[in-house]
Amino acid sequence: MKVYKAQLIKTVYKIEDLPPPDKKEIAFAGRSNVGKSSFLNAILGIKIAKVSSTPGKTRSINYYLVNDKYYFVDLPGYGFASVSKQEKERWNVLMNEYFKTRFSLSAVSLLIDHRHMPQKLDYAMVEWLKDLGTPFLFILTKSDKLTKSEKAKLFEDIKRSFSTYGEYIYMPFSSKTKEGLKEVLKTIGEILGDND
């Protein structure tokens, strides 16, 4: 898949504000500070998502219209401790409603920091997606910060840690070096049925 056009078309804080489900969409989820905004900028080819050094900056569901025919959906980062209980509850309700009602959702790309083993909330997200029957794949971000041997070892360790849930696609990725960019876009294209 080639991205030749991308624009932020909607920022959603309430489930009733979601755009109509008239296009296939792929969502991107991950812990706060996993590099989701940098990842989106890399795959979209333009600086469209705000990159922040403060984790948990994305507090809304952000809809990007890609090539005028697909939605790339940036979900709020999970696991950031310094937001209020009320805000966390709002996020939970929003996410729950989104996953349960969004029939145009083709798959979720779950971003995991390649440098670290998955945490409790990552496993909780996998269990949740499995229970809902939502297809998902793993993108291992910040791969450029590892040596070749560290990368290989952690790749296998992370894969093994999720193996009890089933067989999934795992792709190392670096927003800095663009490692994995072609593979990620190819996989997203296959999921969306786009052969460009």
UniProtKB/Swiss-Prot annotation:
Q: Where on the tree of life does the source sit, at the highest rank? A: Bacteria
Pfam families reported in the protein's UniProt record? MMR_HSR1 (PF01926)
Name the residues that bind GTP: 30-37, 56-60, 74-77, 141-144, 173-175
Q: Where is the EngB-type G domain?
A: 22-194
- One MF annotation (Gene Ontology) recorded for this entry: GTP binding
Positions with a binding annotation for Mg(2+): 37, 58
Sorted keywords for this record are: Cell cycle, Cell division, GTP-binding, Magnesium, Metal-binding, Nucleotide-binding, Septation
**SUPFAM superfamilies per the UniProt record, alphabetical:** P-loop containing nucleoside triphosphate hydrolases
Entry cofactors:
Mg(2+)
Disulfide feature: none
Q: Which GO terms describe its biological process?
A: division septum assembly
Among the entry's GO cellular component annotations, what is one? cytosol
Sum up the protein's function in the record's words.
Answer: Necessary for normal cell division and for the maintenance of normal septation.
In the record, the note on similarity to other proteins reads: Belongs to the TRAFAC class TrmE-Era-EngA-EngB-Septin-like GTPase superfamily. EngB GTPase family.
Q: What is this protein called?
A: Probable GTP-binding protein EngB
Gene encoding it?
engB
